[in-house]
Amino acid sequence: MLQPKRVKFRKVQRGRRDGAAHKGNTVAFGEFALQSLEAGWITARQIEATRRAITRYIRRGGQVWIRIFPDKPITKKPAETRQGGGKGAPEEWVAVVRRGRIMFEIGGVTPEAAKEAMRLASYKMPVKTRFVARDVPAAAEETEVAEAE
């Protein structure tokens, strides 16, 4: 399970989940990606379940990049505890995901295999997602055509 090795503060405020992602919203490492369409918290367990779903489907064919990291501690108070007495103990770690954030990337597989792997992965996510392919610049397409001739 993913979690930070050490943190500056053990407990953090909840924050706001609105707005779009300004960073991490383009495909950077692989050729295909899973992009968030809404904001939310994704737990370390959900990230691990998604990673396993993707890697099981693509087998040894491709490579997977996880673009989000659960660095926010979520606290909980024990059951049947009266209010007061301070904030609860850290219970789990979540990644804050905004609309448009690239969460997972795949490379080295066919578009059909990537789409199916991301479809299976999307079922593990608590937010709506979409399949995204890397934008190929027009100049790169022209050089590929020239090399083929």
UniProtKB/Swiss-Prot annotation:
**Transmembrane feature ranges:** none
- State any single GO MF term: rRNA binding
Alphabetical keyword list: Ribonucleoprotein, Ribosomal protein, RNA-binding, rRNA-binding, tRNA-binding
SUPFAM superfamilies according to UniProt? Ribosomal protein L16p/L10e (SSF54686)
Q: Which GO terms describe its cellular component?
A: cytosolic large ribosomal subunit
Gene3D superfamilies the UniProt entry points to? Ribosomal protein L10e/L16
Pfam families linked to this entry: Ribosomal_L16
On assembly, the entry states:
Part of the 50S ribosomal subunit.
Q: What is this protein called?
A: Large ribosomal subunit protein uL16
State the organism named in the record.
Dehalococcoides mccartyi (strain ATCC BAA-2266 / KCTC 15142 / 195) (Dehalococcoides ethenogenes (strain 195))
In the record, what lineage is assigned to the organism producing the protein? Bacteria, Bacillati, Chloroflexota, Dehalococcoidia, Dehalococcoidales
- Gene name in the database record: rplP
